[in-house]
A protein has these predicted regions:
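His/Asp/Glu-rich, glycine-adjacent segments
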Residues: 135-140, 218-386, 507-513, 517-519, ...
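Active-site-proximal N-terminal segment of extracellular/periplasmic enzymes that hydrolyze or transfer
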Residues: 138-195, 436
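Beta-strand elements within well-structured catalytic alpha/beta cores of enzymes
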Residues: 156-176, 190, 215, 370-376, ...
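Short, structured active-site-proximal loop/turn typified by the sulfatase FGly-forming signature C/S-X-P-X-R
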Residues: 177-214, 218-223
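A long, amphipathic alpha-helix that forms part
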Residues: 350-351, 355, 371, 378-419, ...
Length: 666
């Protein structure tokens, strides 16, 4: 029930906002040309009455019309919607001036400027009311949302819900150092007081698509990499494509998703069976990004929109400054960070994070049974800046603030929640394959297959996904691209006759020969391309190859090989540096229908803990070697402990389902 204190607090907030908005209008009247408030002779401030009336009516119209306009514009992507918020503000200001003509503007554009500046000022004041912390600002919104729910007599389940927060790309070892160094005080407090921190181990394909498919839907079988080729359909599947992700879900409808009952999916690649989705790639429709109503709810608050805009601008200038600093100090390894990347970074670290976090806040107040959210900012910046450099850790600190904010909301929610924090994979660092050896994996394969010199090898169509420099991360790129245009329906393969298709996912490469039927074995590959396998296995950037053979698949290394079925090693074991579970990972992938003709495991240098990605990324993931294969899991100490060791995304799914069923009435 609403207390007198709550009502008084809301009334004070309203009066402060109204009065400060009126004062802002008086100041703008004096410093801006093109805007004139009516004057009165009855007050010391002649323009005060007009300012009070204008501020009140503009605020009331904002409250009434803004949510409607945002829902109407939810059919466009959040980036374009973001621009639309400013146009909407101008329209509301024009309507205000028409209804209460207490001010005059010289030009139409002046009304848009006035609306934007007034909204910006009220955003600042709203934040000041709740102090300067994002947590306090969100808690102010929580009070308002909870008031509306209680006014509507909405009932909240009393059984504990489950909140899963994924920090994309954060490795176990990086997190432990961050906790020790004070980079993540929120997570540190969680681990030291109420939760436990453990590592888990990914499948061979250590990337978000494979992990989330396993964690959210219970199976990532037949997923060899972030992108792969289907010889039957001549189609390249890629996890940044909504149609492909939807197909992956349809293939798993026999398994109830983690979020199937009263669940919510926020910022993920997949729904997990949830019907309520915001920023979910598999539910993108044109540019709606799956659940337009979800992010339009966020933009329905003009203060939120302006807070996000200010932070995006700050993130853009921060990226430009940090990129120049890397070049000036000649910090290596590094990759180009121009083009659209600064905007993708701002989208991933600010816009996507703000929208997803705000949606989770709403979920917690409504009392949803299970919520899974992916915070992608660290992963995006780590790809281009490095896995533990100061600028990357600064982003991690901000995500820690988001986690703290959500924990604070949990404390305010009517329904109790158990909170789990996890990552989908880590990242490994190092100069790229192209930087080290002067050619891409695709160029190397074509050169060896055709016995041509490097200068004669041209860039081919199939390299555009795997080898183009300055490629943003999967999640950030996919979301941002869909914000301004409809995503493509996939890649259809049209390689020249006899030429291989080469795809890359971190330091995992996939080589297909479309002209060879089925899965080509060593004999077929050698007959079609003599010397290719020898050239690849002897290359310093290639750690091992997985290929089919008449007697069973084999792993080939520079000085030895492993029988996949029996595990028998001849010569030096090329998997020895990849960890004790490397053969099991390879064996599982070898059973997939769409495993590549040649699976290429990039070299891992244990002395420096580095890999050489087949993509232009400083921090990479997708294969084996280094911290990329060891993410983390933080869980409440009063829950049953997961298996130790915990191997594979499907095993994590089983653990989360068990915790979900303990916590909620499933």
């Amino acid at each position: 029930m609403r207390t007198v204190g709550d009502v008084v607090r809301l009334l004070v907030e309203f009066l402060v906002l109204w009065g400060s908005s009126a004062l802002a209008l008086i100041v703008l009247d004096r410093i801006l040309g093109g805007i004139t408030l009516d004057q009165s002779s009855f007050t010391p401030l002649p323009t005060l009455p007009a300012a009070l009336v204008l501020a009140l009516v503009f605020g009331l119209l904002n409250a009434a019309l803004w949510p409607v306009m945002m829902r109407f514009m939810s059919w466009i992507g959040p980036v374009l919607l973001f621009v639309g918020t400013f146009l909407a503000g101008g329209v509301i200001m024009l309507l205000t001036l028409y209804l209460v003509p207490v001010a005059a503007v010289d030009q139409l554009s002046d009304s848009f400027v006035l609306a934007a500046l007034l909204s910006l000022f009220t955003s600042v004041v709203s934040g000041a009311i709740a102090s300067r912390s994002d947590t306090a600002y969100r808690l102010m919104q929580v009070r308002r949302q909870r008031f509306r729910l209680r006014r509507n007599a909405a009932l909240v389940d009393a059984s504990p819900g489950l909140l899963c927060i994924q920090i994309d790309g954060l490795g176990y070892d990086v997190l432990r150092r961050a906790i020790a160094d004070g980079v993540t005080p929120g997570l540190a407090k969680l681990v030291r007081e109420t939760h436990r921190l453990v590592p888990w181990h990914t499948d061979w394909s250590s990337q978000t698509g494979a992990t989330q498919l396993g964690v959210l839907h219970g199976s990532n079988h037949n997923v060899p990499a972030f992108r792969w080729y289907d010889k039957t359909t001549e189609h390249i599947s890629v996890f940044s494509n909504p149609a492909d992700n939807e197909q992956r879900e349809l293939e798993r409808t026999d398994i109830p998703g983690l979020l199937a009952h009263d669940g919510a999916s926020r910022g993920n690649l997949f729904t997990g069976g949830a019907h309520d989705n915001v920023l979910v790639v598999s539910r993108m429709r044109g540019a709606r990004l799956g659940g337009g109503a979800g992010y339009s709810d966020y933009f329905a608050d003009p203060a939120s929109a302006l807070r996000t805009f200010i932070r995006m601008v700050a993130e853009l200038q921060r990226e430009l400054r940090q990129s120049l600093r890397q070049k000036r100090k000649d910090i290596l390894p590094r990759v180009p960070r121009g083009g659209v990347y600064p905007f993708v970074r701002a989208f991933a670290t600010v816009l996507a994070t703000d929208v997803a976090a705000a949606a989770v806040v709403g979920d917690l107040i409504k009392g949803r049974s299970v919520v899974y959210v992916d915070l992608i900012g660290y992963d995006e910046v780590s790809h281009h800046s490095g896995i533990s450099r100061p600028e990357t850790l600064a982003v991690l600190t901000k995500l820690d603030d988001v986690v703290e904010m959500l924990l604070a909301v949990v404390e305010q929610a009517d329904r109790p929640y158990r909170v789990v924090v996890l990552s989908d994979h880590g990242q490994s660092q190092g100069a790229t394959f192209l930087q080290r050896f002067g050619e891409t994996l695709g160029q190397l394969v074509v050169r060896l297959a055709a016995q041509r010199e490097p200068a004669a090898v041209q860039r081919h169509w199939y390299e555009r996904e795997s080898d183009v420099p300055r490629q943003p991360g999967a999640e950030g790129r996919g979301y941002a691209a869909a914000s301004v245009h409809s995503p493509t329906a996939g890649e259809e393969a049209h390689a020249s006759a006899g030429e291989p298709i080469v795809l890359g996912s971190g330091n995992l490469g996939l080589v297909y020969f479309p002209h060879l039927p089925g899965r080509a074995d060593v004999n077929a590959i050698e007959a079609a391309h003599p010397g290719l396998l020898t050239g690849l296995r002897e290359h310093p950037g290639v750690g091992f190859l997985l290929v089919a053979a008449p007697g069973g698949s084999v792993v080939l290394g520079p000085h030895g090989q492993v029988d996949v079925t029996s595990g028998e090693v001849t010569g030096e074991n090329p998997l020895a540096v990849m960890g004790p579970d490397a053969l099991a990972k390879v064996r599982r992938t070898d059973s997939f229908d769409n495993v590549a003709d040649i699976m290429v495991g990039g070299t891992y240098w244990p002395d420096t803990d580095e890999v050489a990605a087949f993509e232009e990324q400083v921090g990479s993931h997708g294969g084996m070697g280094g911290p990329q294969s060891t993410p983390f899991l933080i869980y409440p100490a009063d829950l049953p402990a997961p298996p130790n060791p915990l191997h594979g995304a499907e095993a994590v799914h089983e653990v989360l389902v068990g915790w979900r069923d303990l916590s909620t009435d499933y």
